[in-house]
C-alpha cells in the first residue's frame, strides 16, 4: 500500500468544517497534539452506534474503573458522531471496552422486562458465534473459488481443454482413455497453444510458440491485476498482513477491509498467482478473510459500533484465513495468537478455533484440488527419522535464518528505494517488467515453469514405485517381482543429477525474483515463495545425504541405522524441513509454523526435526536483526505500532520524552470556564492537534480533563443548529456548575458531557520503561504528564516510537508515517 494514498485520504486540516484533525499522520500524533482521547470519559457511550447513550467512568492511574454520572443527566439528547474515529487514527481501547461493558449491563438489566428483550439478549450473546460462523463460511468458499480459478488460469498459459474449456490440465485428462501411465499428463483432449496455432506438438517451432504464448498470458494476467488494483482498490496490493497487524493493534485504515478491497483482492489474487510471479496466495487469503470478518461485523450492532470488539472478530478471521490457506485450523489459531493479534482474550481463542474449523470444513466440502485434502502439497512419510539427521536439519535451519536475514534487508532496501525514486510512481510498469523477466527466465526450466504450489508438492513427495518425476530417476536394482512398501536407498540416475542442476538454477532464480516481487502493487504473499526456496534447498541436501548414506553405509554415523537395502533417508522430509526453516527465517514464526507444517504432513514424529530447524532459523535470523518481514514493513511505512516483542531497557524519564520540549511552543490547552465558542473555533482552525487538555486556569495549570478535537467540533456544530442563543461570544463551560454571568451575556454552552474527566496521567519522574509498558498493555495512544497535579506536557505513541528509534541510533523521522 502506498503511503501517499493514505496521506491524501486525510482531510484538509485548516477547514473547520472538516471534522478530522490533520492531513498527515505525523501531525495526528505530533508533539503537543493528541491523536484521540484514550481514557474513559463521559462520552464513553454517547455512541453505541450513532445515537446510543452511555455512562461516564472515572479512572485512576491504578486502573480502577467505576460507574459515575449518567449521560442522560448531562445531555438533552445524544450528539451523533461523538466518540467515533477518523481515518488513520488509533482507537481508544479503554473507552471501547467501557462502552461494551455498559451495553452489556444495559441489555442484562432489560432482559427480564419482556420476551422481546430476552430475545434481544440471546441474539446479542450469540452474535459473536454467528459472525465468526459467517466469516468462516465466506473464507472457505472464497478460498475454494480462488484455488480452482488459479489452477485453471495457470494451466491456460500452456494450453486449453477442448472437450471442456473450464477444465484445467489434470481434470481434462481424467476421463481420457488414451492416457498412459508414463505420460499421464498427455491426452488428445488437452491441446497446447502450439498445437492449436501452428499444428505442431513437437520441435523448435512448437517450443517457441509455447514460449511466446506463456509470456503473453503471464503479461496479460499481471497487467490486468495491477490495473484493477490501481483503478478500483489500491489497498488490495501486497500481502496485507503488516496492515492487518497494525489494524489489530488499534489503528484505523478506512476501506482497507471493505467490500471493494475484498472483491478486487479476490479477483487479482487469482490473476497474480496465474501470472507466474514469485508470490503466493496464502498471505493475501488472511486479508481476504479479515475483509469478510469486517463486512459481516456490520450486521451486528455489538461489533459494528465498537472498534475493540470488531478486532476480536478480525483476530478470528485471520485464523480462518490461515486455516484455508494451509489446511491447518489449529495452526491458524496459533498464527493469529503469535503473529497478528494485539489483544487476544480467551473468548477470542474459542471463536478463532471455531472460525478456523468452519472455514476448513467448507474448503474440504468444495475439494478444490480433487485429492480430498485442503492443500495441494499434502504429503505423508512412512519412514522414521534418525538421530544423525538432526545435523543436516540444523544446517537447513541455518540456511533458513541466513535467507530470512538477507531477504528482509534486501527487500526493505528495494522498497525504500521504490518509495524515494521515480520508479515508485509507475507501479504498472514495474509489475509488467517483473512479470516479463519472470516469465522469460522461468519457462526454460521445468521447475520454475511449474506453479509454485505444484513445485512444492513435487519436492515434498517421497519417491515411490509410481513416481515418474526426474527427481525419482534412480538406478533400480530391486527384484521386479518383489512387492515392497518402502523402496530402499538407491544410487541416483542421470535424471536425478540433471534435476539437481535445474533445482540449483531455480533456487537462485527464486531468491532473486522474490526480493523484487514482494511489495509490488498486486496481491503478493510470501509464504509460498519462501517455502519453495527452502524446499528446493532441502531436497538438494536430502538427495546428497541419501547418496552419502548409500555409498558410505559403513561410516560410523550411518552404520547403526542404514543397512544395505534399507530405506533410511527421505529427501522429501528434508524439503519439508527446509521449507519450514526458510519461512521461519523470514517471518520469525515458531510455534504456529511448526503446527502448520505438521498439519500439512500429518506426521507427529517429525515435530522434533521441524522444531530444531525452525528454532535454529530464528536464532540465526535474530543474530542479524530481531525484526521479521512484517514488522520491517510496518516500520518502513511508519505505522504507529508498538511491538510487544521489543524490549525497552533505557533509563530515561517521562520528562525527557514529553512534548512540548524546551524550545517548542507552549501546550495548546482549553480552560474550563473562561473561553468562548470563537476562541475554541480559532484554536481548532489554527492547530492540527487531535485533542486539548482542559485546565482550571492559565495560572494554576491544574488538570481538569481532556477534550477531543472531533468531539468539540461536532458538539459546537450541533449546538448551533439545535440550541437557540448559541453564538460566537457564548461562554463554553466544562465545569459542573456554570459560573455567574452578566444578564446580557449570550447563553453559555455546556460541554462537560464530552470531557474526559479521567485522562491517563503519569508524573514527570516516571521511568520510560514503565510508560512504554503502560502503552503496550493498555493500548494507550497518549497520556498526560503532570507534576503535583499541574499539567506539564503530553506523550503520544509516536513520541514513544520516535524515542525508541533515537535510543536505537536510528533517524526518528525515517520511521514516521509519511
From Swiss-Prot:
Binding site residues for chloride: 239, 527, 630
Entry comment describing in which tissues the protein is expressed: Expressed primarily in tissues derived from neuroectoderm. Within the brain, its expression is particularly evident in the hippocampus, olfactory cortex, and olfactory bulb. Highly expressed in aortic and coronary vascular smooth muscle cells, and aortic endothelial cells. Also expressed in tracheal and alveolar epithelial cells, and intima and media of the pulmonary vessels. Expressed in bronchus and colon (at protein level).
Biological processes, Gene Ontology terms: adult locomotory behavior; chloride transmembrane transport; endosomal lumen acidification; negative regulation of cell volume; phagocytosis, engulfment; photoreceptor cell maintenance; positive regulation of reactive oxygen species biosynthetic process; regulation of pH
Binding sites annotated in the UniProt record for ATP: 689-691, 796-799
Keyword field: Antiport, ATP-binding, CBS domain, Cell membrane, Cell projection, Chloride, Disease variant, Endosome, Epilepsy, Glycoprotein, Golgi apparatus, Intellectual disability, Ion transport, Lysosome, Membrane, Nucleotide-binding, Repeat, Transmembrane, Transmembrane helix, Transport
Record motif Di-leucine internalization motif, residues: 28-29, 46-47, 71-75
Site residues by UniProt (Mediates proton transfer from the outer aqueous phase to the interior of the protein): 282
UniProt cross-references to SUPFAM superfamilies, sorted A to Z: CBS-domain pair, Clc chloride channel
Listed InterPro entries: CBS_dom (IPR000644), CBS_dom_sf (IPR046342), Cl-channel_core (IPR014743), ClC (IPR001807), ClC3 (IPR002245)
UniProt KW Membrane keyword: yes
Annotated site, Mediates proton transfer from the protein to the inner aqueous phase, chain positions: 339
UniProt GO molecular function: antiporter activity; ATP binding; chloride channel activity; chloride:proton antiporter activity; PDZ domain binding; voltage-gated chloride channel activity; volume-sensitive chloride channel activity
Domain commentary: Isoform 2 contains a C-terminal PDZ-binding motif mediating the interaction with GOPC.
Protein name: H(+)/Cl(-) exchange transporter 3
Amino acid at each position: 500500500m502506498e503511503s501517499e494514498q493514505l496521506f491524501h485520504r486525510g482531510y484538509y486540516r485548516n477547514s473547520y468544517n472538516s471534522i478530522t484533525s490533520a492531513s498527515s499522520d505525523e501531525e495526528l500524533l505530533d508533539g503537543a497534539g493528541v491523536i484521540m482521547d484514550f481514557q474513559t470519559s463521559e462520552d464513553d457511550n454517547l455512541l453505541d452506534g450513532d445515537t446510543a447513550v452511555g455512562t461516564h467512568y472515572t479512572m485512576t492511574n491504578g486502573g480502577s474503573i467505576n460507574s459515575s454520572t449518567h449521560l442522560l443527566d448531562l445531555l438533552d439528547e445524544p450528539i451523533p458522531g461523538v466518540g467515533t474515529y477518523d481515518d488513520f487514527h488509533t482507537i481508544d481501547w479503554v473507552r471501547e471496552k467501557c462502552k461494551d461493558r455498559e451495553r452489556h449491563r444495559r441489555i442484562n438489566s432489560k432482559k427480564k422486562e419482556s420476551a422481546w428483550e430476552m430475545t434481544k439478549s440471546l441474539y446479542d450473546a450469540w452474535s459473536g458465534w454467528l459472525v465468526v460462523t459467517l466469516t468462516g463460511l465466506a473464507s472457505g468458499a472464497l478460498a475454494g473459488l480462488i484455488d480452482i480459478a488459479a489452477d485453471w488460469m495457470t494451466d491456460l498459459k500452456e494450453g486449453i481443454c477442448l472437450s471442456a474449456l473450464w477444465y484445467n490440465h489434470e481434470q481434462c485428462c481424467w476421463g481420457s482413455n488414451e492416457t498412459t501411465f508414463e505420460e499421464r499428463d498427455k491426452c488428445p483432449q488437452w491441446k497446447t497453444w502450439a498445437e492449436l496455432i501452428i499444428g505442431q506438438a513437437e520441435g523448435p517451432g512448437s517450443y517457441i510458440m509455447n514460449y511466446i504464448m506463456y509470456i503473453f498470458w503471464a503479461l496479460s494476467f499481471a497487467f490486468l491485476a495491477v490495473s484493477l488494483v490501481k483503478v478500483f482498490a489500491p489497498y488490495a496490493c501486497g500481502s496485507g498482513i503488516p496492515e492487518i497487524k497494525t489494524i489489530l493493534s488499534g489503528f484505523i485504515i478506512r476501506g482497507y477491509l471493505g467490500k471493494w478491497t475484498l472483491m478486487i483482492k479476490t479477483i487479482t489474487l487469482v490473476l497474480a498467482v496465474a501470472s507466474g510471479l514469485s508470490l503466493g496466495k496464502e498471505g493475501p487469503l488472511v486479508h481476504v478473510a479479515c475483509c469478510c470478518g469486517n463486512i459481516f461485523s456490520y450486521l451486528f450492532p455489538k461489533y459494528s459500533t465498537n472498534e475493540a470488539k470488531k478486532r476480536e472478530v478480525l483476530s478470528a478471521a485471520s485464523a480462518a484465513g490461515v486455516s484455508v490457506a494451509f489446511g491447518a485450523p489449529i495452526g491458524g489459531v496459533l498464527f493469529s495468537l503469535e503473529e497478528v493479534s494485539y489483544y487476544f482474550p480467551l473468548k477470542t481463542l474459542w471463536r478463532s478455533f471455531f472460525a478456523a474449523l468452519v472455514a476448513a470444513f467448507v474448503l474440504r466440502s468444495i475439494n478444490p484440488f480433487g485429492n480430498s485434502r485442503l492443500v495441494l502439497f499434502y504429503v505423508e512419510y512412512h519412514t522414521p527419522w534418525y538421530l544423525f539427521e538432526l545435523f543436516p536439519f540444523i544446517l537447513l535451519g541455518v540456511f533458513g535464518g541466513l535467507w530470512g536475514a538477507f531477504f528482509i534487508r534486501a527487500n526493505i532496501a528495494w522498497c525504500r528505494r521504490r518509495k524515494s525514486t521515480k520508479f515508485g510512481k509507475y507501479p504498472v510498469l514495474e509489475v509488467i517488467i517483473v512479470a516479463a523477466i519472470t516469465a522469460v527466465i522461468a519457462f526454460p526450466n521445468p521447475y520454475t515453469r511449474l506453479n509454485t504450489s505444484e513445485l512444492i508438492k513435487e519436492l515434498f513427495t517421497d519417491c515411490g514405485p509410481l513416481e515418474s518425476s526426474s527427481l525419482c530417476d534412480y538406478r533400480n536394482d530391486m527384484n521386479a517381482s518383489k512387492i515392497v512398501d518402502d523402496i530402499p536407498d538407491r544410487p541416483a540416475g542421470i535424471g536425478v543429477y540433471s534435476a539437481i542442476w535445474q533445482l540449483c538454477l531455480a533456487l537462485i532464480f527464486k531468491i532473486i525474483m522474490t526480493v523484487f516481487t514482494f511489495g509490488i502493487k498486486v496481491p503478493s504473499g510470501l509464504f509460498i515463495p519462501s517455502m519453495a526456496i527452502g524446499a528446493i534447498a532441502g531436497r538438494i541436501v536430502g538427495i546428497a545425504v541419501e547418496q552419502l548414506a548409500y555409498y558410505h553405509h559403513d561410516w560410523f554415523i550411518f552404520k547403526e541405522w542404514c543397512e544395505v537395502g534399507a530405506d533410511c533417508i527421505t529427501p522429501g522430509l528434508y524439503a519439508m524441513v527446509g521449507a519450514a526453516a526458510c519461512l521461519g527465517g523470514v517471518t520469525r514464526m515458531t510455534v504456529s509454523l511448526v503446527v502448520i507444517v505438521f498439519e500439512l504432513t500429518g506426521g507427529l514424529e517429525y515435530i522434533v526435526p521441524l522444531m530444531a530447524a525452525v528454532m535454529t532459523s530464528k536464532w540465526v535470523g535474530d543474530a542479524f536483526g530481531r525484526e521479521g518481514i512484517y514488522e520491517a514493513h510496518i516500520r518502513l511505512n511508519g505505522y504507529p505500532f508498538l511491538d510487544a516483542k521489543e524490549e525497552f531497557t533505557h533509563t530515561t524519564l517521562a520528562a525527557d520524552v514529553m512534548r512540548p520540549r524546551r524550545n517548542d511552543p507552549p501546550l495548546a490547552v482549553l480552560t474550563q470556564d473562561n473561553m468562548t465558542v470563537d476562541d475554541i473555533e480559532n484554536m481548532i482552525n489554527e492547530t492540527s492537534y487531535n485533542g486539548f487538555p482542559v485546565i482550571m486556569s492559565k495560572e494554576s495549570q491544574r488538570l481538569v480533563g481532556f477534550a477531543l478535537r472531533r468531539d468539540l467540533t461536532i458538539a459546537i456544530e450541533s449546538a448551533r443548529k439545535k440550541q437557540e442563543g448559541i453564538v460566537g461570544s457564548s461562554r463554553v463551560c466544562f465545569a459542573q456548575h456554570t459560573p455567574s454571568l452578566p444578564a446580557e451575556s449570550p447563553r453559555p454552552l455546556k460541554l462537560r458531557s464530552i470531557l474526559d474527566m479521567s485522562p491517563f496521567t503519569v508524573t514527570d519522574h516516571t521511568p520510560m520503561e514503565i510508560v512504554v509498558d503502560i502503552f503496550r498493555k493498555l493500548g494507550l495512544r497518549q497520556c498526560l504528564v503532570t507534576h503535583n497535579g499541574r499539567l506539564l506536557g503530553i506523550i503520544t505513541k509516536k513520541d514513544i516510537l520516535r524515542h525508541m528509534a533515537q535510543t536505537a541510533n536510528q533517524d526518528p523521522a525515517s520511521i514516521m508515517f509519511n
